[in-house]
């Protein structure tokens, strides 16, 4: 069979014959991950049909591959803990990591991923993609599957296709643990201040909070539930609104440590003592919680382990393997420190 002249034209011919992109053909030629076994064989068969013969042998692939990690923002300790876990996992497995940030300064998103950007990642030989607290459209999910990019989502902001692989913590159980601790101290007016109400972790923690209240015979009060953002400023604003209620809470369960920092700031602004006048529980156990005044009681979630698991699972998907679980949830545990105490009698 006659060959098409030129390497670029030949790649076009192979891609057309196999029904895949040129980026996928390039991955097969160079021994890179990110292509299923079935697709890899289809490309090889197309190469035989069009008479393609590489002029050079395949390049030595990286031991594991290169993974793109996309963060919504890196301006909070949570993201840095997850990144630390991803990097540790990459070092253990011999992979490489490239990071992208959608909101570099924590403000409005400046660069949505989009299918075209995903095409560029595939062409650059990325084995897969890890998204941390970021949103995906159906079009972007389809593009990842089409390009053979292993895709794992850590703490998704929005409910996703059940077929997607996600990594998180036992948020519901953590919400129960935090609220039960406050109830055991005698609190009954317990506020919940969290991030975006569409956030999967925020909703799961809310459900745990409500479950603990109802199990204790305490009727959940919608006035005590606030959503805004996982940020200190938002935590301060939400707490001020809670403290302005006719019957303010004696304790606040913050949906993240960053929010808890804002809760503490609001308490200082009102000259309220923590925990004498207001008890506070955070969620994450990020660095700095031991150094607040007082040290913050918080729900520990294994953020570094979440990063490690996400990296390992992405590489599994890139190799065409079935992951151990489609929805990984790592255990949380309550760490009692100095920011919680029985409520003051009024």
Annotated model-derived regions:
Residues 123-133, 191-193, 225, 246-256, ...:
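Periplasmic-binding protein-like
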Residues 38, 72-81, 99-112, 156, ...:
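Hinge/beta->alpha junction and helix N-cap segments in small-molecule ligand-binding domains
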């Amino acid at each position: 069979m006659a060959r098409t002249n030129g390497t670029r034209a030949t790649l076009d011919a192979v891609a057309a014959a196999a029904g895949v992109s040129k980026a996928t053909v390039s991955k097969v030629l160079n021994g890179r991950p990110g292509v299923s076994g079935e697709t890899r064989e289809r490309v090889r068969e197309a190469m035989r049909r069009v008479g393609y013969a590489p002029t050079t042998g395949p390049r030595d692939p990286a031991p594991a591959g290169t993974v793109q990690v996309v963060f919504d923002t890196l301006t909070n300790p949570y993201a840095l803990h997850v990144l630390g876990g991803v990097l540790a996992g990459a070092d253990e497995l011999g992979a490489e990591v490239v990071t992208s940030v959608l909101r570099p300064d924590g403000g409005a998103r400046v660069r949505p991923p989009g299918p075209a950007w995903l095409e560029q990642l595939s062409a650059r030989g990325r084995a897969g993609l890890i998204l941390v607290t970021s949103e995906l459209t159906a079009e972007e999910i389809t593009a990842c599957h089409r390009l053979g990019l292993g895709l794992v989502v850590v703490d998704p902001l929005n409910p996703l296709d059940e077929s997607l692989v996600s990594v998180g913590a036992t948020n519901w159980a953590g919400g129960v643990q935090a609220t039960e601790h406050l109830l055991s101290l005698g609190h009954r007016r317990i506020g919940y201040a969290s991030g975006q109400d569409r956030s999967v972790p925020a909703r799961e923690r809310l459900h745990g909070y409500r479950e603990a209240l109802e199990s204790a015979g305490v009727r959940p009060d919608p006035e005590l539930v606030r959503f805004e953002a996982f940020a200190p400023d938002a935590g301060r604003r939400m707490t001020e609104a809670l403290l302005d209620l006719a019957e303010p809470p004696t304790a606040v369960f913050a949906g993240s440590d960053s929010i808890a920092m804002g809760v503490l700031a609001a308490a200082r602004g009102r000259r309220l003592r923590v925990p004498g006048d207001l008890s506070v529980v955070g969620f994450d156990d990020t660095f700095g919680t031991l150094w607040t005044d007082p040290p913050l009681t918080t729900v520990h979630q294994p953020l570094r382990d979440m990063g490690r698991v996400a990296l390992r699972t992405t590489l599994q998907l890139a190799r065409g393997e079935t992951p151990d679980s489609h929805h990984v949830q790592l255990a949380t545990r309550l760490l009692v420190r100095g920011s919680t105490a029985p409520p003051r009698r009024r």
